[in-house]
Amino acid sequence: MGKKAKVKVKVKKRKLKLKRIFFCLIFLFLIGGIFYLVKKIPITNIYIIGNNIVPDKEIISSAGIDNYPSFIDTSKKDIITRLKRNNYIKEVKVEKKLLSKIYIYITEHKVISLSNNKILLDNNTEVENTYNIHNVPILISDISSIKEKYTKSISKIDDDILLKISQIEYTPNDVDSERFTLYMNDGNQVYITLGKVTKINKYNSIYSRLEGKKGIIYLDSGDYIEVKEE
């Protein structure tokens, strides 16, 4: 009798082990299936924020996600690396949200001026005018001798004021070798030096003092206005 009881106990233990193995396999199969299905979930929405020059479509294509690939397999690092190959793009931040949404935050280089269809950016790099940018000051002088300082200084001009400048001419005199003339879209003329370039950011206030007349604004020295005779 004792031997039979031992045999039954062994059989029961073996059955319990088999059940455990079976349930473990089922569990692993379910986990694997869920992971496979989740991995197959594609990107459903792509949001591009902060770009003004580079089009959304180009950003998505350059990032390598224009075919809306697997959300999980999409690498944020890869997107950043690909996008920063574009000379116009300064910084990129990527966020993945809600298991299917990609947010791409773009910081572009500031466009300083245009010369011979070459765009000068705020990092002192000249690039091709790939995006046909025209609402930017045209540089009509050779500034090679002070290019770096010119770029650094002009980049301090507020964007809305930069849009008001039609042309920039390098016009040094005996007093200041860093003197420039800004020809405004409204017909006014501004003399300024690189060291005092931020004064132009108050242009709207200065312009209001002209009361609709045209004039020459001297911000290089004296800060006064010479009204043009009509």
Features from the language model and the residues they span:
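Solvent-exposed coil/turn segments that connect beta secondary-structure elements
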Residues: N51-I53, Y88, K97-L99, T107-V111, ...
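N-terminal positively charged amphipathic segments used for targeting/anchoring
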Residues: M1-V38, D174-E230
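Extracytoplasmic segments of membrane-associated envelope/inner-membrane machinery
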Residues: I104-S177
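Second-shell loop/turn segments in exported
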Residues: I48, I65-P69, V136-S144, N188-L194
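Periplasmic polypeptide-binding modules associated with outer-membrane biogenesis and secretion
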Residues: L18-F27, G33-L37, I41-V54, S61, ...
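Extracytoplasmic/secreted envelope proteins and their assembly/folding machinery
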Residues: D56, I60, K76, I80, ...
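Soluble periplasmic/extracytoplasmic beta-strand elements of cell-envelope proteins
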Residues: N45-I49, K93-E95, K101-T107, I119-L120, ...
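Extracytoplasmic
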Residues: I41-I43, V54, N87, K97-K101, ...
